[in-house]
């Protein structure tokens, strides 16, 4: 499978995945998709299938927030494409949850056919090359956090965060780690 200069697969893509897992992943990454994008590709979600790992990776990125997740898939041919997040999410959410979803893209990576027991859909997307790369953390300290402690801390603070996108600074919570504890 050919790679582009950014290490992404290009060309044909063929895979089968679970509707329930894909729907959950789309709901997650769609939170990072721009509602009024400055560039058309930012309204899309990047789907990248890897036959070597048997995983389908989904990425949403609005140039300030990026979310990436992956799910198990039966990948016959590795490839990547970007598809309109809203439309893809609406289609996938309406498909039967007990039916697998088949994806087949064209050679150019601009159109995909999505097939399940509920029907067949054709979507036009954009090449994966057009999607911006997520920034990488170049320096920092890795840490392990007890998931239960993190959930407890977030539940105790998230009520105070704003849901108003106009006040972006207030939509999150501040976490501080001192090596032994989290605050």
Language-model-detected regions and their locations in the chain:
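Structural preference for solvent-exposed beta-strand-turn elements
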Residues: 1-183
